[in-house]
Design a protein with these regions (language model features):
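Conserved SGNH/GDSL esterase-like catalytic core that processes O-acyl groups on lipids
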Residues: 27-120
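Alpha-helical cap/lid subdomain in secreted, periplasmic
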Residues: 86-175
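Boundary at the C-terminal end of the N-terminal hydrophobic targeting segment
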Residues: 11-15
Length: 175
């Protein structure tokens, strides 16, 4: 008589990493949006790969063991994720979280970092309630030419790098 025992081995990675963001996270309008979507877990089940899948690919090549997740919504800031996605985000504690807000700091009041500062603190507190040891990384977005050259933009008539400087200053204040 031969007895075969099959044991269940945990397939989870050493470190969980969640990306929270918008189209800047998944590269809207590019092939990267769906790049290697099967290598990451899209918490919204939209089949997105994007920057999280690129990170996963680089991590794998470097021999780093990450379970990579993403929770994204195009055109949104952290305020959207706080108001609508805490149930999804809070399903588990995270080891590391990479997040960013709206590309102009505030969709209703461009170049004003107040909402970003407030929502970064709120999201960080929520994530720390899930895991007191979570590492939270805030990544700034980049300049958008379509917003620098519009007449109603706070960056109208300035060099494109001014938007980058202002956005970075907002993220520095939020950090």
């Amino acid at each position: 008589t031969v007895v075969v025992t099959i044991s269940s081995l945990s397939a989870s990675a050493e470190t969980s990493l969640l990306f929270i963001g918008n189209s800047f996270t998944y590269a809207y309008g590019s092939a990267a949006k769906f790049y290697r979507a099967d290598s990451v877990t899209d918490l919204n089940n939209e089949g997105i790969g994007g920057v999280p899948a690129l990170f996963k690919s680089f991590a794998d090549q470097a021999g780093l063991d990450y379970d990579v997740y993403l929770e994204t919504r195009g055109g949104s800031g952290l305020d959207f994720h706080l108001e609508n996605k805490l149930g999804v985000i809070g399903r588990r504690p995270w080891d590391r979280v990479v997040m960013h807000g709206f590309s102009t700091l505030d969709s209703s009041n461009p170049n004003n970092p107040a909402v970003l500062i407030d929502t970064t603190a709120q999201m960080s507190n929520f994530l720390q309630e899930l895991n007191p040891d979570v590492e939270v990384f805030l990544t700034a977005t980049w300049s958008r030419a379509d917003l620098v050259y519009q007449s109603d933009s706070p960056w109208n008539g300035t060099p494109i790098e001014q938007m980058a400087i202002d956005v970075r200053a907002g993220y520095d204040a939020a950090a």
